Amino acid sequence: MSKEFEQISIKPGFMKHNGGVLFRAISENEYEFKSIINENHLNAAGITHGGYLSALIDAGAGTAAHRAAGNAPCVTISLDIKFIGGSKVGDEIIGHTKILKKNKYSCLFILWAKM
């Protein structure tokens, strides 16, 4: 699988506007994605906006599902996030996705992120 991260948000759109997402495959069912926090990602309190982190997680998980589905279009149906800490400018957020089950119509996975 790929050792280096690749930019996945190269088309115009929301994630490119927010700085893009770096992504790599660890195995057929495991993937990693990352982003480095900059000033555009901060909320009024000076920490990373939860909306940006949610979008990052959704993009990373969506790309993993897309790859696992043989590059078929995929959408997020449910996303549950628990924030347990804050991040700031310069922090690197790394997400890890592990696909637990997949079939023709759905993909179930667990995802966690750290800085």
Model feature map: region roles:
Residues 1-115:
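Terminal targeting signals and extreme-terminal segments of soluble enzymes
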